[in-house]
Regions:
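Iron-sulfur-associated redox domains of electron-transfer enzymes in respiratory
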Residues: 1-174
């Protein structure tokens, strides 16, 4: 779940601005059948660490600068379509969605962690461009798609309503 999704969901249901609704979202997702729920804030930190290392490496080795982020698939498409000369400036790092999906899929490849279940990684993002990111060639590990499904904030809200959940009254879960 992306941070912007949390804010939009709380706003949609008229909840107090600035108050975290992540626990309520976790509850709703569990009621809809999700086993585990992860926040992309963790993987955003991983992305920043990787981009920092890449930036330092570029400085030390005199490689192409400035370093442009690759976190937003719409931005990457814009650069690759309109400004091809800046493609070498794009970071090679995955987005937080891509990082989290790869980490979770790798962890649950181990049968001890998977508990006999197949891991399906569903990403909840504010932007439809994340759907295209999930099927890019660099979003696969060993031939397997890392992010299986991407749903938008609007789609999540529709799911909550279709399940008949009264979001405002849900108790927070961890």
């Amino acid at each position: 779940i992306a941070p912007a999704v949390r804010v939009a969901v709380g706003d949609h249901y008229g909840l107090t601005k600035g108050k975290s609704v992540m626990g309520k979202i976790v509850n709703a997702l569990h009621r809809m059948g999700f086993d585990e729920v992860y926040d992309t804030s963790f993987s955003a930190d991983l992305t920043i660490m990787e981009e920092s290392a890449e930036f330092l490496d570029r400085i030390k080795k005199g490689k192409k600068l400035p370093l442009l982020t690759s976190c937003c698939p719409a931005w990457v498409k814009f650069i690759t379509d309109q400004y091809k000369e800046y493609i070498p400036n794009l970071s090679t790092c995955r987005s937080p969605q891509g990082m989290l999906s790869a980490v979770i899929k790798e962890y649950f490849r181990d049968p001890e962690h998977a508990g006999g279940k197949k891991t399906v990684m569903i990403s909840i993002m504010p932007c439809t461009a994340k759907k295209a990111e999930a099927v890019r060639p660099n979003s696969f590990t060993d031939g397997e798609q890392d992010t299986d499904i991407v749903i938008t904030t609007t789609e999540l809200l529709r799911m909550i309503d279709n399940f008949g959940l009264d979001f405002a009254t849900l108790d927070p879960e961890a």
